[in-house]
From Swiss-Prot:
The active site is at 83 (schiff-base intermediate with substrate). It comes from the Bacteria. This is Probable transaldolase. Its EC number is 2.2.1.2. Its main location: cytoplasm. GO terms for molecular function: aldehyde-lyase activity; transaldolase activity. It is found in: Cytoplasm. The lineage of its organism: Bacteria, Pseudomonadati, Myxococcota, Myxococcia, Myxococcales.
């Protein structure tokens, strides 16, 4: 399973790259707003850093606007993937952009049937939002399981990109279900590396090492 980092913070991207845990990047307007920078400046910098897929989200909600923004952002680099919402106009934009050779990530997916439509339209990625479904007492990972099964049933090439990841269990379940990608906040990447028994074991090893006779200097 590939790891994308879900951020527009260049510092976090650099840290994930140094760990070998950044196969790609996903951004959205909310993440860009947190940086206090203009989106195009951020995108240009990310393109210089990351060789893998970089999702750049349109803010237009109409078909023509999505095409205009998508075509513009696609010029920033061959690794740029245009991110569009799962709406009727969004699906239409997916079809057009895909026919033009542009990769598309369909975002804000909350049902397996929506994911089926995105695959039929030719999406490169589908982004089911597991955390937001969990927030309203629905089962986000059950949605992912259904999407993975449907795509396998019919041989769709669209990759399942699990989004709205809130904690390590989401990552674990995505991997168990066979999702292609999980896009993960840097804070969750750090949590993945942590375990209390690892900390306790390291503390014990270091304490025991202090008891080992040392050669005179």
């Amino acid at each position: 399973m590939k790891f994308f980092i879900d951020t527009a913070d260049v510092g976090e991207i650099k840290k994930a790259l140094a760990l070998g845990l950044c196969d790609g990047v996903t951004t959205n307007p909310s993440l860009v707003a947190k940086t206090g920078r203009g989106f195009e400046d951020v995108l240009k910098e990310i393109v210089q850093l990351v060789p893998g897929p970089i999702s750049a989200e349109v803010t237009a909600t109409d078909y023509e606007g999505m095409l205009r923004e998508g075509r513009h952002y696609a010029k920033f680099g061959s690794q740029v993937v245009i991110k569009v919402p799962l709406t009727v106009d969004g699906l239409r934009a997916v079809k057009t952009l895909t026919d033009e050779g542009t990769k598309v990530n369909v975002t804000l997916c909350f049902s397996p049937v929506q994911a089926l439509l995105a695959a039929k339209a030719g999406a490169t990625y589908i982004s089911p939002f597991v955390g937001r479904l969990d927030d309203i007492s629905q089962d986000g990972m059950a949605m992912v399981a259904d999407i993975v099964q449907i795509y396998r049933n019919y041989g769709f090439k669209t990759q399942v990109l699990v989004a709205s990841v809130r904690h390590p269990v989401h990552v674990l379940e995505a991997a168990k279900l066979g999702a292609d990608v999980a896009t993960i906040p840097y804070s969750v990447i750090e949590q993945l590396a942590k375990h209390p028994l690892t900390d306790a074991g390291l503390k014990k090893f270091l304490a025991d090492w202090e008891k080992v006779p040392k050669a005179p200097k």
